[in-house]
């Protein structure tokens, strides 16, 4: 289990750009590349998040708490919304949303590697002075990570 803080203007499954419409993915993998023969489909959680508003004519949907490409309204499954921005108001980055996440994976072995990463698409993450602001546009942080072992006989 862990707390995931989603900062800024995540766009969910689609970003609304007329070209190169790509999702903002967040990925959790168990044992990535440790066992190249094994099917990793059950050891991977791929989802999207959206901090966008949702109106009848404009709504950038997210997958969470389901796997991508499932569609839910923005901020579905959140624990807390409208937390402080990660950056000052000099950039348009949005608020922070907290998700308390619990995931389980089957595993047998003496060691485990858990990898958390994103595939964010940020073509417009440039401030008024032309400086790239990726962290302020879309980023995330993790807190309170707990790994538990449950033994089944």
What is the role of each PLM region?
Residues 5-22, 54, 122-125:
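Extended, low-complexity, turn-rich repeat/linker tracts enriched in Gly/Pro/Ser/Thr and Asp/Glu
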Residues 19-81:
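Extracellular ligand-binding interfaces
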Residues 11-30, 137-141:
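Short coil-to-beta strand junction motifs in C2/discoidin
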Residues 56-57, 61-152:
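Terminal, low-complexity interaction segments
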Residues 12-16, 36, 148:
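A generic structural micro-environment signature
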Residues 5-7, 29-33, 50, 117, ...:
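Predominantly extracellular/luminal cell-surface or secreted proteins
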Residues 2, 18, 132-134:
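Alpha-helical protein-protein interaction elements
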Residues 1-2, 6-9, 108-113:
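Extended extracellular/luminal ectodomain segments enriched in beta-structured repeat modules
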